[in-house]
Amino acid sequence: MENLTNDNYYENKEYMSASQFKDFLKCEAYALAKIKGEWIEETSNAFLVGGYVDAYFSKELENFKLKHTELFNKDGSLKATYKIAEEVIKRIEQDDYMMHLLRGQTQLVQTGTISGVPFKIKMDSVLDDTIVDQKIMKDTKDVWDNGYKAFWEMYGYDIQLAIYQYIHAQNEGVMKACKLAVATKESSPELAVYRFSQKTLNNALEIVKNQAPRYHEIKLGLIEPVGCGKCAYCRSKLKLDETMEKEI
């Protein structure tokens, strides 16, 4: 397999990533369409704000600016829509503990296997005893999805950090604590740090171990993906027939 670096990390399709795995959990058909380039999602303003902050702290801001010129005015300043990114950065830099968490080895790329499936990870900040993932979010409120869920569960951050911890341990021989360093995009940004219990990470890892082989076979074209029937991709592929009529 190709040796992964920061430069080619997002180009490689041979490895499963945490983001890719979470896509498969949502909808197998949608995830495969994204991998094949058959379904391209529009980049949201919220995603770009988070990307700007991430790039700033990982010292990749100049590359980010070159890729996303639409964020900037002719004089190089951020457009009004994205100004909140500067407020978030300012708030983070005022907090010594947040800055400590983000001063580890940044954007560390590693590879390994889970249940025989090749995985790749790219971590925001790795300290001697902790893996830190930075999240720039709308807020930290629980999210409704057929009942309220904690934001970290709703967005699969437990899955993500479980993958990071497991693959990093394969490379380094030590299981490190996993934390989320969160800043919100509110007018007065909130800062929060969440430490995952090992029980939470172990439970999430079991999901990965159980599902990864199936998702890998879908990527290889050995089995057909199952659509959720609810996401935007599935709705775009829906073909009506007489049996789907609704009586009113």
Language-model segment annotations:
Residues 82-89, 153-155, 163-248:
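Metal-dependent nuclease catalytic regions and adjoining charged, substrate-binding loops involved
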Residues 51, 55-56, 130, 162-166, ...:
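Residue-level signal for well-ordered alpha-helical scaffold segments within enzymatic catalytic domains
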Residues 116-120, 127-129, 186-189:
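Coil-to-beta-strand transition motifs
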Residues 40-42, 74-77, 143-155, 197-199:
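Short histidine-centered catalytic/ligand-binding loop motif
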Residues 45, 49, 160, 204:
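Hydrophobic (often cysteine-bearing) scaffold residues that line and stabilize catalytic clefts
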Residues 121-147, 164:
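Conserved catalytic cores of phosphodiester-cleaving nucleases, focusing on short active-site segments
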Residues 1-122, 226-232, 244-245:
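Metal-dependent nuclease catalytic cores that hydrolyze phosphodiester bonds in DNA/RNA
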Residues 97-102, 127-133, 168-176:
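Secondary-structure boundary elements
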